[in-house]
């Protein structure tokens, strides 16, 4: 991890870590890296996004880049526009699910996949050097504005077909998804009820679409007797789902269900997920001809493995899904359309979810300054291997140790000053016992680091 880029691009507090001055330099660095070309730029609804976008575009133009500004746009729309306009790259101004005082910058390749760590490292090198490409007055890049929403919906309707109409409640969380997700659902032929659908940087609910933040969505689904509720984070690269009974469907369960549906839709193949995904996915997709491949946390790692192995679906247990037949950009909006197609073909989610194996999953966060993370992980690795009776070790991203009926993942956050502990066990007592031991170990490691 470099000075600027984490697991999801550049992210931090506006006017502290992420400033207009930095955005200007990032624009220059991207233009220098590309040597010109064409770049699509979009932003989320945060109050600071317009300021950062303007600075970034200035930097791009100064290096001779042609900029297509699509304005307020969910991340999936930026990824789609990159391919639609045959751009060399794309940039999104967003902090995704982080609180409103945060913002960030994420760069995308011409195929819709996020920049890899190696590509980001090269951008960092250019940023640090200050040796930016400069063009004369008559070669400054051109700026034009575009709106790819109509084309996005048209293409999506070619891939997703419904036989019946459903009542869908869409909670966009005041984020960028509000300009697209409800409209796609309506064009699919559904009756749409919108919540938090006015774009605003003053978010009404917590942006991460989880059981707590979606209590309003769940209540609306029950009251309106809707078939499903769909929610997004700030840039709509994630999806959260509430079933027809008004219950939030755990990320692990939805990941398994949609992976299984993709296997039914496209035939047997490889499913890519991350090291923090549990046993349920493997157990659910194996009978359907699915082979699970695990990789580092982050959509770029998932997209990279999908491309390498020709996988048919990739997703994280955070509601981040990548559908390679559509794009290599994580897309919560297109995912919502697929959820409706799954309901149309297989039945209510409440019934489908009962088929997914359930294990006990616990998560914890331990505060840890960023400068202590590397040393703390060294201590954790050494102590965890001594303290737990494990059968398998995966160290591609943090430390994951497994036994036949449990696993634990110790991993430093790439976006926050915390250490994350994720674990799963077959029983609640075992899960609590493991978490108590794991938390104690991590707190001691941070203290010693």
From Swiss-Prot:
One GO MF term: magnesium ion binding
Post-translational events: Activated by phosphorylation.
Gene Ontology biological process terms in this record: carbohydrate metabolic process
Catalysed reactions, as listed in the record: alpha-D-glucosamine 1-phosphate = D-glucosamine 6-phosphate
Gene3D superfamilies named among the record's database cross-references: Alpha-D-Glucose-1,6-Bisphosphate, subunit A, domain 3, Alpha-D-phosphohexomutase, C-terminal domain
PROSITE patterns listed in its UniProt record: PGM_PMM
Sequence positions that bind Mg(2+): 96, 233, 235, 237
Listed cofactors: Mg(2+)
Cofactor stoichiometry and binding remark: Binds 1 Mg(2+) ion per subunit.
Recorded family membership: Belongs to the phosphohexose mutase family.
Function: Catalyzes the conversion of glucosamine-6-phosphate to glucosamine-1-phosphate.
Name recorded for this polypeptide: Probable phosphoglucosamine mutase
